[in-house]
C-alpha cells in the first residue's frame, strides 16, 4: 500500500510546504495539491513544495483540461519534473460544472476531452512535435522546449462515473477516486478492470487511489467531529446512486443542501449522521484507521490519499499516520 496526502492550497504556501515536508519525513510517498481558481495557484504551490522537499512525488490532484490547454499543462508538468528532480505526477480529471459555469467555460464532452488531452500531453512530454485533430482537442504543430527528467510522467485520472472509470482503466497509470468506503470501490474497480481488459492491460499496471476524507486523532470523538464539516459537503454533492448505495437518509441530505445554500453551517453539520460519516470518511484513532484502510486494500485499492481534514490538528495527524498507520499497512 502506498500513502499519499492531499492539500487544498487555501492557506499560506509556506505553511503548506511545512506540512508536506513533515509528511515526507513521516513516510508519505505522494503529495496531491487541488487545483481551483479561487485558491492559491496549484503550480506555484507545487514549485515551492518541490524546492522544500527531496523524495515525495508531487502533482496537481486534480487539474482539468478546460481551464488550461493540454500544451500549457504539459509545459507546467515538464517544468515541475525538472525542478523536482523527476518527482512529478499529473492528476487530471473532468473538473466540475459549477466551477466552469462560474468561469463562463463550456463543459464539452468530458470523457472525450480528457482522453484526447491526456494523449496530447503524453506526446508533448515525450518530446514530439504534435499536430492533432481530435473531436475536441486541436493542436497544430506544437512542441515543448523543456523535457521532463522521467521517461514518462505518471498520469492519474480523476474518475467517478462509469465511462470515466472505464476510460481510466484503458489509458491511465493511476486512478484517483473520491471515496473512503469499500462499497464505492466494489462498484468502481470492476469498471476500471473492464477498461483495462479492453485495452489489453493488467490491473497491476494501474495504481488505484482512494482520495479519502481522513481524520485521525488519539481521541476518536475529536477525529469524528473534525470530519463532520467535510462529510456535510460530500453528502450534499453526492449523486442519488451513491446515497442509495450507502442507505443514506435523503431528507437529511436535502436539509444539509438547503442549509449550506443559505450559509447556515451549524444546521448543515447537525444533520450529518453516523451513516454519512462511515460512508464518506475514514476517521478515528490510528488503530481504527488501519482497520478501515485494510478493508480498502482487500477491495484492490493500492494508494490511500489522506485528504481533508486529515485530523483535528494537521501536524499531530500527519505524525500519527506516519508512526502508526503507514507502518501497519506496509507489513
Swiss-Prot record:
InterPro entries: F420-G6PD/mer (IPR050564), Luciferase-like_dom (IPR011251), Luciferase-like_sf (IPR036661), MeH4methanopterin_reductase (IPR019946). Gene3D superfamilies: Luciferase-like domain. GO terms for cellular component: cytoplasm. Keywords: Cytoplasm, Methanogenesis, One-carbon metabolism, Oxidoreductase. Pathway: One-carbon metabolism; methanogenesis from CO(2); methyl-coenzyme M from 5,10-methylene-5,6,7,8-tetrahydromethanopterin: step 1/2. One of its GO terms (biological process) is methanogenesis, from carbon dioxide. It holds the Pfam family Bac_luciferase. Its main location: cytoplasm. Belongs to the mer family. This is 5,10-methylenetetrahydromethanopterin reductase. It comes from Methanocaldococcus jannaschii (strain ATCC 43067 / DSM 2661 / JAL-1 / JCM 10045 / NBRC 100440). The lineage of its organism: Archaea, Methanobacteriati, Methanobacteriota, Methanomada group, Methanococci.
